[in-house]
Amino acid sequence: MGSPEGEEAVVATAAVVEDGLRGNGDGGGGGVGEVVGVGRSIDMEWRKAEEAAIRRYEAANWLRRVVGVVCGKDLAEEPSEEEFRLGLRNGIVLCNALNKVQPGSVPKVVEAPSDSADGAALCAYQYFENVRNFLMGLQDLGLPTFEASDLEKGGKGVRVVDCVLSLRSFSESKQVGRSAPLKYGGILKPSMSGKHFIRKNSEPFVKTMVRSYSAELLRDGVSLEQSLGLDFSLEHVERTTPDSIRMLVQTMLSDKKPEEIPSLVESLLSRVIHEFERRTANQNESVKHALDPNDDKLLSRADTPPEMESTCTCSTGNMDEEDHTSVSMKEEVSTAVLVNGENVVEHIQAKQTDKYFDQQQKHIKDLKSNLATMKSGMEHIKLQYSEDLDKLGKHVHTLSHAASGYHKVLEENRKLYNQIQDLRGNIRVYCRVRPFLPGKVSSSSSVAGLEDRTITVMTPSKHGKDARKSFTFNRVFGPLATQEQVFADMQPLIRSVLDGYNVCIFAYGQTGSGKTFTMSGPKVLTEEGLGVNYRALNDLFNIQAQRKDTFCYEISVQMIEIYNEQVRDLLQNETVDIKNSSQKGIAVPDANIVPVTSTSDVIDLMNLGQKNRAVCSTAMNDRSSRSHSCLTVHVQGRDLTSRTVLRGCMHLVDLAGSERVDKSEVVGDRLKEAQHINKSLAALGDVIASLAQKNAHVPYRNSKLTQLLQDSLGGQAKTLMFVHIAPEPDAIGESISTLKFAERVATVELGAAKSNKEGGEVKELKEQIACLKAALAKKDGETESIRSTQSSPDIYRMRMGSAPPAFRNPMEEVGNLETRSNGTPRQKKRNFELPDVENDTSSWLDTSSQKEAALGEWVNNSQFGSSNSLLELGPDATQDVVFYQRNSPEPQWSWAGSVATEDSDDFEVTTSCSSEQDMVRPTSAPKAPGSANGSASIARKAQPKGAKSTDIRSTNPAKRAAPLQKKINGPPSASTKNGKQLSLSAADGKRAPNGKVSAKK
């Protein structure tokens, strides 16, 4: 393009560019350019204002987050330009923000008074000091700054906003740890913005690269020529065109948004091409008109553009040469434009690609470095974690070992503690705190603290301060304790029933404290809500099934209530009486006893009992129990191997709650019920107090309740009291009274409980005794004739010591006697009536054959001819026969003479649970009425045949006696006292007022 024609074409191109730029920037030009220019001018002004406001809001919000409130003032979220300038005018906000981003950048910030109004000017020194320090800090960081005058009215607030946003960008880059150079002066936009690269498929990649790169350079204030190093063949343009063209381009593009620059460049290029096409077409038209002979030359010159006049004038000679010249010039212009455009695109693409690759390489290096650092860090952390885990594992192992040892020791301590409790016979006391009722949850509770065995309650103080008092029991359960947890702690106590022990568990507390819930459960039974009654019987059934190969158990239940001092059977709804001396330890024998074999049977019986129980609604409890309920479980077990019989009894008592009449608001029958309840509970308190003080007299009979619990509280059972308290603050008085009573109960020592166990041999011997008693009753009638024929001299002679001596051996076991065979033969004593001895003294000298015949007759009559016979005589027992022989042609043996007397050790018979004195009586007895005055003794009359045998009042094996074979041994000793021998009737004989002996009924 060194020819004059090429230079002129370039000049024309520059002119078109200048016209296009001026048309876009100033609104000049005609046609479509003017319309587009005006529309874009209006739109640009609006966009610029909106962008400035958005950037100002962003700067203000960032300052609000970083600095906060300064001098009691705060920047608005969306400040105007004036508000923004006034807020930053004193420089305090700017200095504080800079110190937040880069600590220590401004060593001293001059603070303004807190009461200064907005916009109030500081002194010149303060103003200059803060702003100068801020600008110096920005310069040290390499950030763009502004002039101090920009903070004054009429200053350029845009530069202040750009400065704040650049500081924000620096802060963000510092937080994320970016090391790449950043560009400041507005919102931080990465050089490879994804927004520019996400284009439509129809837009070439080259245009995208050009637009992105051009937008960044123009935002940084760098000219297109300086950035690209290209001149677009502008060397010729600079020689022929003024510098205002370049300034115009820079001015127009510097105020545009990055996204608007590509469209502006496209519009400029399209106008240049359009202008070239238009001028080329005009030139062709001019040439055609010039070749037309009819046209005037002046007209042709007028229509020809000025740039082509010289060409047309110089080519008047040869029209083909002119046409060739114009065509070649058009091609050269088009080629120059295309070549320059391609070179620009290629250069931009190459430079952008190189820059992109450099950045990517740098990023890759940074990533590799970071990856290596992270790997080494992870290895170090992994090693450290491994060491820490090893240490932690060893520590956990040590703790688990210590914890297992602690739990083991704790369990051993608990077992030892329970053993001590069993030996001492203390009443176990458990405490349970009821949770707040639904809908009555209170923010405050009277319970201040709960531990395993200690409860602390808040007590009202006289000085207005809450005092605390602690109580210690065997176990304390909080409001969150479940029914299963409560039962698990008392389960060993309940299971001891199967071992033959008596157990008593009773719930105590004020009304509405949860006693019935603990013992029976909620109104609607669920598996989780089953109370102690159901769980205890279910546990007994399970153990019964487990021991079915070794033990045979029979379980039966009673259910009674004490209502207004009347004992009622809940299973029959009848009134019954309490008999503490009844058989087999049953306190209420008249109550219905129902055998049970499964939990369903128990549930049916409990439902029936609860249905018949007296329950009423009061102001304190909608389901208040108006009576004391007692579920008694009787267990009788038999060892299949040793035939040992075990008997156990368990009382599960749900006491009615104590209540205050003013709170329960009861009247009429309810008031009477409350009075009886409080009276019986007071009697229980008196019994506990007497037991705690170890008084000789304990007032059990003051109430039906204490009379029912006499066996349990008197030392014959393992006893547990379950106290219940309510957590409401208004019930603190009743709670403290309940806890004090429970604390006193815990000090009571009842002694070790005894197991109700009897061996198989003892049971058989008792059965034999019962049979002997029955036979004795039948033979009592036959002794009447023998007693009437006895003479009084025989009685006198027997009392004076002429009777054969008798011997007593020490008692080794109650009911178990043995006869020794080493020594002098011993005569067995028999009970003889005084008339029998007096009438016939020759009976002392009967022969051995007569004795054997009489003995055989006795065996036949008593129906005990088997090996179980009570009398077994050895070969050397001839003297015994002489002692028992009667002098009669047909001797008759009295049954009373074949049974041991109370003075003899041959046979002893127990008749009641309190008959130890009956089994072995003193050797002294009242004298016969006839012996005092020397007259003949009065003949005794025997008991009629129809007399019944004595009832057995107790089945306690320790209280029973059974006959065993006894051998003869030892030296003779007289069984006389004061020279007079005693004469008693049968074991159960009782002297009548007339001197006769009759069987005890």
UniProtKB/Swiss-Prot annotation:
Keywords: ATP-binding, Coiled coil, Microtubule, Motor protein, Nucleotide-binding. Residues 972-984 have a biased composition (Polar residues). Residues 426-748 form the Kinesin motor domain. One of its GO terms (molecular function) is microtubule binding. SUPFAM superfamilies: Calponin-homology domain, CH-domain, P-loop containing nucleoside triphosphate hydrolases. Residues 53-172 form the Calponin-homology (CH) domain. One of its GO terms (cellular component) is microtubule. PANTHER family: KINESIN-LIKE PROTEIN KIN-14P, KINESIN-LIKE PROTEIN KLP-3. Belongs to the TRAFAC class myosin-kinesin ATPase superfamily. Kinesin family. KIN-14 subfamily. This is Kinesin-like protein KIN-14P. It comes from Oryza sativa subsp. japonica. The lineage of its organism: Eukaryota, Viridiplantae, Streptophyta, Embryophyta, Tracheophyta. The gene is KIN14P.
